[in-house]
C-alpha cells in the first residue's frame, strides 16, 4: 500500500508539502543566473490538500505584506507564486500548478525516506517526487508579490526524468550481445 504524505501548515507562512514533482533543480550548487539554490515544484491539480495548505500560507504572506510592505492594501499588480501548468509549454507541467522556490542564504538539506542525507546530486533530479518545506514571504522590490523560500527537501520516489534527460549507459546497452558462433581467438 502506497503511503500518503499530507501537507501541513507549520506556521502561518511555512508549510510542508505533500508529494510534489521536482523540476529544474539547482540544489547542490547555486544557479549561476540567480546566485541561489532553487527548483520548480509541480503540484498536481487534484492534490487539494497541498494546494489548500499552500493557499493558506500565501494568504497569510499577503496579509503580512499588506500590513508591513504595501501601505495597508494588496496591490493591484500583485504577483502570486502559483502558476497554471496548463498555460506552460514545458514537459510534465500539464494538469499541475507550479511555483519556483529559492534560497540565496543556504543550501537546502536533502534527505531520503530514512531521513539520511542525500549527497549524490544524481539522486535528486527533474522528474523525481519529493516533499518540501517552504516559507512564503511578501516583497515590494522589483514589483509586489509573494515569493517562496526553499527550506528543505525529502525525496519520496523516483519518476520519469523531465526535460529529455538522457538515458544511462547501462540502459542503452542492457543486452549481453549474441554469440556469433565464431572462434574468439583473433591472433590465429
What do these predicted ranges mean?
Residues 1-98:
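OB-fold ssDNA-binding interfaces and closely related basic DNA-contact patches used
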Residues 50, 106-108, 157-163:
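A broad, structure-centric signal for solvent-exposed, well-ordered loop/edge residues
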Residues 64-145:
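Structured, beta-strand-rich domain cores
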Residues 116-188:
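Compact mixed alphabeta submodule
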Residues 23-24, 44, 112, 120, ...:
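Serine/threonine-rich low-complexity intrinsically disordered regions
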Residues 40-42, 100-102, 154-156:
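Residues in well-ordered beta-strands of folded domains
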Amino acid at each position: 500500500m502506497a503511503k500518503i504524505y499530507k501537507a501541513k501548515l507549520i506556521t502561518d507562512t511555512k508549510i510542508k508539502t505533500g508529494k510534489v514533482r521536482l523540476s529544474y533543480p539547482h540544489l547542490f550548487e547555486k544557479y549561476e543566473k540567480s546566485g541561489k539554490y532553487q527548483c520548480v515544484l509541480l503540484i498536481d491539480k487534484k492534490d487539494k490538500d497541498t494546494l489548500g495548505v499552500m493557499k493558506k500560507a500565501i494568504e497569510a504572506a499577503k496579509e503580512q505584506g499588506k500590513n508591513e510592505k504595501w501601505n495597508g492594501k494588496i496591490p493591484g499588480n500583485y504577483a502570486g507564486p502559483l502558476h497554471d501548468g496548463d498555460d506552460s509549454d514545458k514537459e510534465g507541467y500539464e494538469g499541475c500548478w507550479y511555483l519556483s522556490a529559492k534560497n540565496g542564504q543556504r543550501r537546502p538539506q536533502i534527505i531520503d525516506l530514512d531521513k539520511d542525507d542525500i549527497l549524490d546530486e544524481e539522486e535528486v533530479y527533474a522528474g523525481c517526487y519529493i516533499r518540501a518545506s517552504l516559507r512564503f514571504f511578501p516583497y515590494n522590490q522589483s514589483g509586489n508579490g509573494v515569493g517562496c523560500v526553499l527550506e528543505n527537501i525529502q525525496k519520496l520516489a523516483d519518476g520519469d526524468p523531465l526535460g529529455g534527460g538522457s538515458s544511462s549507459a547501462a540502459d542503452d546497452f542492457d543486452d549481453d550481445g549474441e554469440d556469433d558462433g565464431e572462434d574468439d581467438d583473433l591472433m590465429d
